[in-house]
Every structure is written in C-alpha cells, then in structure tokens.
C-alpha cells in the first residue's frame, strides 16, 4: 500500500460539511475503513475549519492506487469535496534526529 495526502477543497458550506462529519454515518464509515471493508483507508485527518480555514479538509490515506480513495469516499462525499490524491513518502523526523 502507498500513502497519499489529499487537501480536499469543500464544495459545500463548511457548516454543512461539519454536520456531516459529526453524523453517525461517519462513525460507520470509519468502522468500515478500520475493518478493511473499503479499498482505501483514511489514516489521519486534519480539520482547519474551526480555525478559520473554511474551505479545506486534509487527509492522509493508505491505498493501492489513488482511484481507490475516490471509490472509498463514494459519490455522495465527492459532491461535498474534491479529491486529488498526491502520493507521498513519510519522513519521521524523530528517526532522522536519532540517526
């Protein structure tokens, strides 16, 4: 599996997006990813919305290919945000420092 960083741009109002993210459906979505029921898995997300950046949501994904991320998100989520995955390597700066 490869790592992909995605800076999603919101297509809907940030308040609407926040409501969706707090819904019970997101808990089920997270469980499905954790149990390997989806082709890709969101490992971490960073939410800048509470801090004034109301047009982006950032995620680190694990997937075999970038298309698996769109498949995992599904059409409903893709109406709410963009998905342009960028394959990345992780640098663990603590390991570099210990080096």
What function would you assign to each model-found segment?
Residues 1-56, 64-71, 89-99:
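Short S/T/G/P-rich N-terminal loop/turn motif that feeds into the first structured element of a domain
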């Amino acid at each position: 599996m490869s790592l992909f960083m995605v800076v999603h741009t919101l297509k809907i109002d940030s308040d609407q997006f926040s409501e969706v993210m707090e819904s019970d459906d997101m808990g089920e979505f997270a469980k499905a990813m954790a149990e390997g029921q989806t082709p890709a898995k969101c490992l971490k997300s960073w939410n800048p919305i509470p801090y004034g950046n109301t047009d982006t949501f950032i995620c680190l994904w694990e997937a075999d290919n970038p298309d698996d991320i769109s498949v995992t998100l599904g059409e409903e989520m893709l109406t709410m945000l963009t998905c342009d995955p960028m394959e990345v390597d992780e640098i663990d700066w603590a390991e570099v420092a210990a080096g």
